[in-house]
Design a protein with these regions (language model features):
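Hydrophobic beta-strand segments of well-ordered beta-sheets in folded domains
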Residues: 26, 67-77
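Long, hydrophobic N-terminal alpha-helical segment
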Residues: 1-51
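Electropositive phosphate-/nucleotide-binding environments in soluble metabolic enzymes
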Residues: 7, 11, 49-56, 73-76, ...
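Residue-level marker of positions within ordered structural domains that often coincide
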Residues: 22, 67, 128
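A structural micro-motif
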Residues: 24, 45, 68, 88-91
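Glycine-rich, aromatic-bearing surface loops/beta-hairpins
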Residues: 75-135
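Alpha-helical scaffold segments in soluble metabolic enzymes
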Residues: 12-19, 57, 61-65, 78-81, ...
């Protein structure tokens, strides 16, 4: 365990968030999503499980570390309430048709599957840049 990192974030999830660059996409999905099949086609190449966690809780944990991209009009596809709260600002969300979402997911950096059983609860987050003060 480390200070300041949500306990729901495994070492693998933190590792993937660190590997991602700005503009990379991260998929967070429910258990109904064909995640294992699609994850094989992502940059990371394998599925990451976030067991025991629903999508709102998982998204909040991930967004506690990962900034959203501010250089694109819609850095998120789906789920407004959790994203706005984590970012502290209103975030435009893009809506994608089911099969268009699957294609976009294949181009993502990685896929994290939660234990959420709600249908079509998946979304994509585009990573932004952390603005650090100069030393």
């Amino acid at each position: 365990m480390l200070k300041g990192i949500d306990q729901r974030l495994s070492a693998e999830i933190v590792h993937v968030l660190m590997l991602m660059g700005h503009g990379d996409d991260l998929v967070i999905c429910d258990v109904n999503h064909p995640a294992a099949t699609i994850a094989a086609e992502t940059t990371y190449g394998k599925l990451i499980d976030m067991a025991g966690c629903d999508i709102p809780t998982g998204a909040a944990a991930i967004l506690s570390l990962m900034p959203l991209d501010t250089f694109v009009p819609a850095p998120v596809a789906r789920m407004q309430a959790v994203v706005d709260r984590a970012e502290g600002r209103a975030v435009t969300i893009e809506s994608l048709e089911r099969f268009a979402f699957y294609e976009a997911a294949k181009r993502s950096f990685a896929i994290i599957r939660t234990a959420d059983s709600g249908p079509y609860g998946c979304f994509i987050l585009k990573k932004g840049v952390v603005d650090l003060p100069e030393l």
